[in-house]
Amino acid sequence: MFKFCFVTDDKLTPLSKLDNYLKIIFESKVDCIQLRFKNLKTIDLYNLGKDLKKDCVKFKKTLIVNDRVDIAKSINAHGAHVGMDDLPYNQARKILGRKSIIGVSASNKNEFIKVKKLKG
């Protein structure tokens, strides 16, 4: 589906340098951005996501929100990525709808088998 996905991170891509990274990303062949800031307040993540969504539309990039299905839905992101300890996949699918992208983490063989059995 994606050739290159850029994943933001609290430590590797701090907010203070995010604009610099995004300028490069928007001009590159990266086709997906995963918004993954685990330590941001909800309102700050929402505002960042809302602004990033506008830029993603402008530059034809896909936006995925990590862990926060509620934020993904509220900013009309292309989808969300959830882990085994987050909102269950089936609930994320109900909230985001059939057309949204939903990624699921699998950290070991048993989790991979569970993810592989998911439908929808």
Go through each PLM region and give its residues:
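Conserved N-terminal beta1-alpha1 strand-loop-helix module at the mouth
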Residues: 1-89, 94-110, 114-120
